């Protein structure tokens, strides 16, 4: 009997350096949870940009109102719905201290990316602006990495960008994510220790929704 599989769009991969020994990294669930939350927030940003494509690409409007502040409100709501964490009140949330430090920095990087594209987004008389989720995600991740040295990427098999091509471990993770028995709810992840125990790699699956098929 053929095993049923589910199509996946790819995975988010996060390399989080924490300078611990190999055994300590495995025991440090805080590092893994921080990586998971960062992946969910980054994906929430991509989803938000995707949901606003009709507005962004409307040639009849000048000022779209899709400001960094408007983006922040939407992505904060989406992240709260998915991760059950309120970015506006992180001090009261039961999340790792590392996450309390890094989540606002990722949000700032995403807002800065939206700010950079304001002249493009608000250009009248032009349809497609090129400000798509992939572009947003790459540039926001680069800004975040420059400030924190935490590396984020989205990969798939095959990958459109050779620089983001999955390695053997990521290919195996994607195969596991594609199994019909793998949970589709709860933002489940796969993690491993890398760089001689100095960092942890966290992978979050991205599944195709009905609207993508």
Model regions: which residues?
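Detector for the c-type heme attachment site
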Residues: 212-213
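Extracytoplasmic c-type cytochrome modules immediately beyond a signal peptide or single-pass transmembrane anchor
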Residues: 24-207
């Amino acid at each position: 009997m053929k095993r049923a599989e589910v199509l996946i769009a790819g995975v988010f991969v996060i390399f989080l350096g924490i300078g611990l020994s190999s055994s300590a990294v495995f025991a440090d669930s805080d590092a893994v949870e921080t990586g998971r939350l960062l992946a969910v927030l980054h994906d929430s940003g991509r989803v938000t940009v995707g949901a606003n494509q009709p507005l962004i690409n409307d040639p009849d409007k000048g000022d779209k109102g899709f400001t960094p502040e408007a983006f922040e409100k939407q992505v904060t709501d989406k992240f709260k719905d998915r991760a059950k964490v309120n970015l506006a009140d992180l001090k009261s949330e039961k999340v790792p201290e590392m996450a309390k430090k890094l989540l606002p920095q990722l949000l700032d990087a995403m807002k800065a990316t939206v700010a950079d594209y304001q002249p493009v987004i608000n250009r009248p008389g032009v349809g497609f602006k090129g400000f798509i989720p992939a572009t947003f995600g790459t540039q926001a991740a680069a800004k975040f990495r420059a400030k924190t040295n935490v590396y984020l990427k989205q990969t798939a098999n095959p990958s459109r960008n050779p620089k983001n091509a999955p390695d053997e471990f990521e290919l195996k993770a994607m195969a596991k994510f594609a199994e019909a028995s793998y949970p589709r709810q709860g933002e489940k992840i796969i993690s491993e220790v890398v760089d001689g125990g100095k960092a942890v790699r966290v992978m979050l699956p991205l599944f195709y929704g009905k609207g993508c098929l």
